[in-house]
């Protein structure tokens, strides 16, 4: 069994390749061509968490990702285990330290934006100034002709640092950050709504990906009620732990991203529509990244 270190993993996965692989994975999910069990999660008394997600996308490999975080004496860590789909034998350990999770999460946002944002979108707002926020900016710049980026974070130091490192403009309030943005990406651990519908402009596409556990939320109810289009990476999961979990009537009218990508559900039909995409993160994304690495960077 091979062990591929972080440098090797990173050398095999570009932003464009990740976006293509994640796009194909969502389409395969919609087509019913994947095996994707529910996530396994473990929460320890000391605050530490372990999350395991995986899938088989129909290719030569199946994979699962183990991600640990919030431990009091350590940071985030993770690895992906890859097995031969024909024999079940271990094929490789991808010792990426969680990097694949970061890029596959950002790739899903790029896929969502390409499918649902206005094609002429040029302005991007990021709520949150952490490691994932930087991946989001990079992924959206790769997928769109983004001309300006605005960032908000609760910490002035964090948002100023992020702005300097990512060629962005920092703002003091969420309302100022969101105003006039073509695409808004929420990637915070907030447990209280940050964005209200009145903050949004006509035609805005909102991606909420911080609400990946029950209790987290970034969008007020009126955003979910007022949006013309409600999409989730997986409606059933988002209805349990995502933004959609907070409002049953919103979950009832939401559609899966894969169904939009495959034409089963209607996407944006006018430049004035407000669209919302709720992302919890799926095992198919992790399997797609593993497939990329194992095939040398081709989706």
Kindly label every feature range from the protein language model.
Residues 1-101, 117-120, 283-287, 294:
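N-terminal ligand-binding/catalytic initiation module
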Residues 116-123, 145, 201-202:
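Short helix-loop-beta connector
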Residues 124-125, 275:
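Conserved beta-strand elements of the Class I
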Residues 128-130:
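Glycine-rich Rossmann-fold phosphate-binding loop(s) that bind the pyrophosphate
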Residues 133-134:
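N-terminal Rossmann-fold NAD(P) dinucleotide-binding loop
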Residues 142-164:
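NAD(P)-binding Rossmann-fold cofactor-contacting core
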Residues 168-246:
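Rossmann-like adenosine-cofactor binding region
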Residues 215-299:
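Adenosine-phosphate binding glycine-rich loop
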């Amino acid at each position: 069994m091979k062990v591929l270190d972080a440098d090797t993993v990173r050398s095999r996965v570009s932003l464009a390749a990740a976006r293509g692989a994640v796009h194909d994975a969502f389409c395969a999910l919609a087509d019913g061509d994947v095996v994707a069990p529910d996530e396994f999660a473990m929460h320890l008394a000391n605050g530490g968490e372990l999350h395991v997600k995986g899938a088989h996308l129909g290719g030569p490999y199946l994979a699962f990702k183990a991600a640990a975080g919030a431990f009091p004496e350590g940071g985030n860590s993770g690895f992906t285990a890859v097995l031969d789909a024909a024999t079940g034998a271990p094929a490789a350990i991808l010792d990426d330290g969680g990097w694949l999770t970061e890029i596959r999460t950002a790739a899903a946002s790029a896929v969502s934006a390409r499918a649902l944002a206005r094609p002429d979108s040029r302005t991007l707002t990021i709520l949150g100034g952490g490691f994932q926020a930087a991946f989001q900016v990079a992924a959206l710049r790769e997928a769109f002709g983004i001309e300006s980026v605005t960032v908000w974070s609760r910490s002035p130091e964090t948002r100023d640092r992020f702005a300097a490192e990512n060629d962005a403009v920092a703002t003091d309030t969420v309302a100022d950050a969101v105003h006039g943005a073509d695409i808004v990406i929420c990637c915070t651990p907030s447990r209280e709504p940050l964005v209200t519908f009145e903050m949004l402009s006509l035609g805005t596409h909102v991606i909420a990906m911080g609400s990946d556990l029950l209790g987290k939320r970034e969008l007020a109810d009126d955003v979910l009620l007022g949006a013309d289009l409600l999409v989730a990476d997986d409606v059933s999961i988002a209805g349990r732990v995502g933004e959609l979990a907070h409002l049953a009537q919103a979950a009832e009218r939401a559609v899966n991203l894969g169904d939009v990508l495959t034409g089963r559900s209607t996407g944006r039909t006018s430049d004035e529509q407000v669209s919302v995409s709720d992302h919890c993160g799926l095992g198919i994304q992790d399997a797609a990244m593993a497939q990329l690495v194992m095939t040398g960077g081709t989706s």
